[in-house]
């Protein structure tokens, strides 16, 4: 399942076989474009998520605290923290909300004529989907294109258990989990419940701030 770069093509009713196609990062975003070699999938050994860094995302509906696991996703956590520390996520909106799937953000702001893509400022990163962390409810993971090593700034939070997104998933690559919600899961549930049109919130849910916390 890949998350497509085209923002409005996600179907409103999702079967398990099509849901993966919605996790692609929307927009240009500066991802890698090299053709990957075909992987030989082997299911990673599950690991316990360990919190090494903490981030608070303040949204227009409340705060979401994240515990990030640099022990198992060092590249992904370092990348996410760069965007947080740069203030990149301020005024970003949740551009995709699918109640029983994910809430996704990290690539769009609200302009006068609709959503405006915010170009990623760092190169795409290596995919760490084989780290043994699972796409369970409340975990945060990176969105990407169909190219495995293409994640930049866009992320999603799982609103339900989405183990079909784990490596190898249907595309052979999976999606990299790098943390979990430690406080504010009720805010995630508020976001997942907002009214949407073509999986885009009718009223913006905006990230007001994102910062590292003790």
Q: What role is predicted for each listed range?
A:
Residues 20-23:
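Bacterial Sec-type N-terminal signal peptides, specifically the leucine/valine-rich hydrophobic h-region
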Residues 11-18:
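Sec-dependent signal peptide hydrophobic core
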Residues 2-5, 9-11, 26-214:
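Cyclophilin-like peptidyl-prolyl cis-trans isomerases
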């Amino acid at each position: 399942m890949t998350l497509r770069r085209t923002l409005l093509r996600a179907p409103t009713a999702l079967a398990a076989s099509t849901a993966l196609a919605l996790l692609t990062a929307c927009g240009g975003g500066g991802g890698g474009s090299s053709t990957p070699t075909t992987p030989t999938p082997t299911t990673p050994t599950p690991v316990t998520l360990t919190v090494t860094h903490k981030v608070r995302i303040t949204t227009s509906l409340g705060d979401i605290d994240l515990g990030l696991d640099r022990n198992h996703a060092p590249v992904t956590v370092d990348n996410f923290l760069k965007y947080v520390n740069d203030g990149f996520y301020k005024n970003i909106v949740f551009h995709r909300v699918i109640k029983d799937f994910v809430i996704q953000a990290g690539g769009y702001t609200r302009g006068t004529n609709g959503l405006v893509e915010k170009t990623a400022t760092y190169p795409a990163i290596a995919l760490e989907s084989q780290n043994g962390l699972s796409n369970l409810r409340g975990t945060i993971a990176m969105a990407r294109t169909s190219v495995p090593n293409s994640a930049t700034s866009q992320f999603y939070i799982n609103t339900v258990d989405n183990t079909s997104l784990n490596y190898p998933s249907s595309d052979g690559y999976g999606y990299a989990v790098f943390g979990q919600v430690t406080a504010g899961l009720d805010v995630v549930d508020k976001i997942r419940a907002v009214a949407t049109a073509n999986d885009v919130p009718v009223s913006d849910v905006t990230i007001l701030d994102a910062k590292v916390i003790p």
